[in-house]
Amino acid sequence: DACRVFSEHVDWQGGLEWDFAALHDMPIDPAFTRLVDEYLTDVMREKSKRKGWKLPETTLVLPWIVRMFPDAHYIYLVRDPRDSILGGHKTDDLADFGVSYPTTDDLLERRAISWKYQYDLVMATPKPERWMEVRFEDFILHQERELTRLEEFLGFPLGRIIVRPDSVARWQDADVVPDFDFLRPHFVDA
């Protein structure tokens, strides 16, 4: 619901363009604040020194989350859109979150538009002091290097996990290769 409150303030320019500028300075809608506070009640009550959350939908409201939590550590994990849109995500249809965009019955195109919208929103958001970008492909193929970077950023050691190199560039084996002109600048050569 917080995503829908936020999206009311996004100015769709038509096509694949949105103006996010007002979101950085306007007062945050009190309904949004209430919904986020409700949603994060358990996280905020937690007494641990380290706490947080990982939700893809957070990207849909990033400008206001950054303003509400300016001292948080933000890790932006971004993946080659061709791989990202092969699988389903809760954010596949932006209309579910009140975001206007060119409607299409093509599922991959809808996912591609969602990927672009979220990427554009992140790029338009003034970065907080504690911001780090991690490429999914780098994390998978160079895990130790990326974990070292993350540990330096966060200030504490992280556990190692098993990663699957076959999760990188899986679009190459897809029945239908997602190739949208508006995503090409974001393709990764792993």
Where are these regions (language model features)?
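PAPS-dependent sulfotransferases, especially Golgi type II membrane carbohydrate sulfotransferases
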Residues: 89-92, 97-98, 104-108, 116, ...
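Short phosphate-engaging motifs
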Residues: 58-61, 84, 142, 146
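Conserved phosphate-donor/acceptor-positioning beta-strand/loop module used by diverse small-molecule
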Residues: 54-57, 65-89
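PAPS/PAP-binding and catalytic site of the sulfotransferase fold
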Residues: 1, 65-69, 133-158
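PAPS-dependent sulfation machinery
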Residues: 1-53, 59, 94-102, 186
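Short, conserved active-site loop motifs that form the nucleotide-linked donor/cofactor pocket
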Residues: 72, 130-131
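N-terminal cationic-hydrophobic initiation segments that often serve targeting/anchoring roles
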Residues: 44, 65-66, 123-126
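Soluble or luminal CAZymes and related metallo-dependent hydrolases
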Residues: 27-35, 54-57, 107-118, 142
